[in-house]
């Protein structure tokens, strides 16, 4: 049977993650209260942040920035918008 959580981001019952996606206490909090759907949305946003801000993930500061943004995205006031991103028009 699939594990379900009340997703803190989507504010609905949804399929839970299979394992903590990040180490430490933050990963545990995400595992317990974030759905697969919300995690997938974060991964897309994280990719935009990395690309638009030209982050080097070998740099400790870039990884700390992304961890802070991830915490804000799920448990705070929301992550930064990707600078320079223009949504596609139809």
Curated annotation (Swiss-Prot):
Domain of life according to the entry: Bacteria
Keyword annotations: Iron
A GO CC term assigned to this protein in UniProt: cytosol
GO molecular function: iron ion binding
Record's signal peptide: none
Pfam families: Iron_traffic
Gene Ontology terms describing biological process: cellular response to oxidative stress
PANTHER family the record matches: FE(2+)-TRAFFICKING PROTEIN-RELATED
UniProt function note: Could be a mediator in iron transactions between iron acquisition and iron-requiring processes, such as synthesis and/or repair of Fe-S clusters in biosynthetic enzymes.
Family: Belongs to the Fe(2+)-trafficking protein family.
HAMAP family attached to this UniProt entry: Fe_traffic_YggX
Protein's name in the database: Probable Fe(2+)-trafficking protein
Organism the protein comes from: Herminiimonas arsenicoxydans
Taxonomic lineage from the root: Bacteria, Pseudomonadati, Pseudomonadota, Betaproteobacteria, Burkholderiales
